[in-house]
């Protein structure tokens, strides 16, 4: 098969799981092309693959840890143009794929349908209208149109691939609101992780080690500061901070001896394997990677970001970690870290998810799913 993968560039989770799929399809002898933009395209290239430049689409905006729906709508609308759609049409015509996989990139779906190429949506969020609730008249009207558009997409694609654990273990279950009419087109693949646990190297950290990752958005730096202050309160717990592309570690002064800043890394998996707990935002991709490596999570979701808040709530309710806040002070952060280390039930549950991720083998499951549907 000739596979074309379109990647949404807002959040590295989209890129990570598409790289996992690309690796799997290539290993099985299929032809793979990537379409990406921004730092997602850069990560694809740093991993060793070529990528075609595609127009950016959805733009997320916020400040001081709060998601700004109005600003996000404005920046997204400014990005959209007929010329961008025509560019995607030409790319599909040039590459002539047998199947298009579109991870959160909706222009790719519409263009594939225009070219009559089978297209599958990869996504973990299906209640986008929640972003627009109680945000004023403008946002409310926008939410109505957004819901209609997404409902069209979900009902018109050839299939929906959900890169999460199947129910009842799904982290995205509060974000999963799809009409029963499309149930037959939904496939829970399990986590799509670039590196399996057995294949990953392991960083030789002093233990216990807390891995703190801020993802890709610079306005999350407030969490770094609070976690850094928490680290100063107990030197017997070690911390490793992986910063996102927009964070300069040099901005943090007076770093204690039990803290290490690594800057941004394209390969976080040895860090996961060498750690005992992950502190992250509420993004689905990092949560899946952490759980697939058996790690409990302290999740700091972006405020007013419904999807992340739902993910964090599920983590707490299921006993995989705790939902935190940008207002959580360092003393309470430390108390939560100690609680997770002292209560073995957290690690027992997340180790079970690590074992389940190995059994499900998400990338291979997607490959087999598509090979079955598109034989010959």
From Swiss-Prot:
Transmembrane annotation, as ranges: none
Gene3D superfamilies on file: Glycogen Phosphorylase B
Superkingdom assignment: Archaea
Keyword GTP-binding: no
Entry's Gene Ontology molecular function annotations: hexosyltransferase activity
Keyword check for Transferase: yes
Pfam family, one: Glyco_tran_28_C
Keywords for this protein: Glycosyltransferase, Transferase
E.C. no: 2.4.-.-
InterPro entries linked: Glyco_trans_28_C, Glyco_trans_4-like_N
PANTHER family (UniProt xref): GLYCOSYLTRANSFERASE, UDP-N-ACETYLGLUCOSAMINE--N-ACETYLMURAMYL-(PENTAPEPTIDE) PYROPHOSPHORYL-UNDECAPRENOL N-ACETYLGLUCOSAMINE TRANSFERASE 1
Protein name, per record: Uncharacterized glycosyltransferase MM_0582
Native organism: Methanosarcina mazei (strain ATCC BAA-159 / DSM 3647 / Goe1 / Go1 / JCM 11833 / OCM 88) (Methanosarcina frisia)
